[in-house]
């Protein structure tokens, strides 16, 4: 009964206005009131402040500063094996496994479309059909910066407007096509392990999604798909990130979805749904034994990137950001 009521609220409540209100409040400097809210949050969610670079809650001027607090370097050591891809976020694995052609598992008995997740871009989807996916849920108590599983060179970023449903276990089991419906930022990288997508999914009360190379992607929420591309290889204009390096952050809540090409990686055997994740711990292992740190990522051809753009029925060329 209670779960049915919670689900009903997901459809009834004005999620966009709640999210805007939360974002506004979380960015305000309110002195003692800010500290009180942070202290109550820490107590309620049992946040481990000993891991933070600034463990004193009085040192945060806004709730957002607290929420995206950096951790001490030593608390999240990065696995240095060049054959190992590491976890991109602190949280819990919602689902993981093989992408069955165009189907990704959302929850037991519920699938959603790979192509829909990628905003109808069937050529980008072709890179990952029958590949591997991992969905990581970040709870309110978790560290909310997102890091790189491996070295990567950014090739494309797409902002997809959408709903703002919560992305917890209850909604994943009951809201059809949840991750393909919600607002999200799709980041496509060239890596030593083939193409990799890292997708930051928004949710109710998620005030903003940011990346280290472009800053705040949303808000504003303009209701249009936006797209940016970068050249292949390392050059003055490229965005090259190292394994374990921060790539983005959420200001409140949400989910990260990783997509890997078929035949390139094997997920760590011990991982399963509801496994706890910590940044830097092993997530997957290369199917090729002798990957070196200096291996050159295989770039996607420029014409393929452009073809992906043309293939997406949801993109308005006049409004693209290239």
From Swiss-Prot:
It catalyses: a 1,2-diacyl-sn-glycero-3-phospho-L-serine + H(+) = a 1,2-diacyl-sn-glycero-3-phosphoethanolamine + CO2. Its cofactor is pyruvate. The modification Pyruvic acid (Ser) is found at residue 254. Binds 1 pyruvoyl group covalently per subunit. Residues 308-322 have a biased composition (Basic and acidic residues). Is synthesized initially as an inactive proenzyme. Formation of the active enzyme involves a self-maturation process in which the active site pyruvoyl group is generated from an internal serine residue via an autocatalytic post-translational modification. Two non-identical subunits are generated from the proenzyme in this reaction, and the pyruvate is formed at the N-terminus of the alpha chain, which is derived from the carboxyl end of the proenzyme. It comes from the Bacteria. The keyword Lipid biosynthesis applies. The record marks 253-254 as: Cleavage (non-hydrolytic). It is found in: Cell membrane. Pathway: Phospholipid metabolism; phosphatidylethanolamine biosynthesis; phosphatidylethanolamine from CDP-diacylglycerol: step 2/2. GO terms for cellular component: plasma membrane. It is a peripheral membrane protein. The active site is at residues 90, 147, 254. Keywords: Cell membrane, Decarboxylase, Lipid biosynthesis, Lipid metabolism, Lyase, Membrane, Phospholipid biosynthesis, Phospholipid metabolism, Pyruvate, Zymogen. GO terms for biological process: phosphatidylethanolamine biosynthetic process. GO terms for molecular function: phosphatidylserine decarboxylase activity. Pfam families: PS_Dcarbxylase. Heterodimer of a large membrane-associated beta subunit and a small pyruvoyl-containing alpha subunit. Belongs to the phosphatidylserine decarboxylase family. PSD-B subfamily. Prokaryotic type I sub-subfamily. PANTHER family: PHOSPHATIDYLSERINE DECARBOXYLASE, PHOSPHATIDYLSERINE DECARBOXYLASE PROENZYME, MITOCHONDRIAL. This is Phosphatidylserine decarboxylase proenzyme.
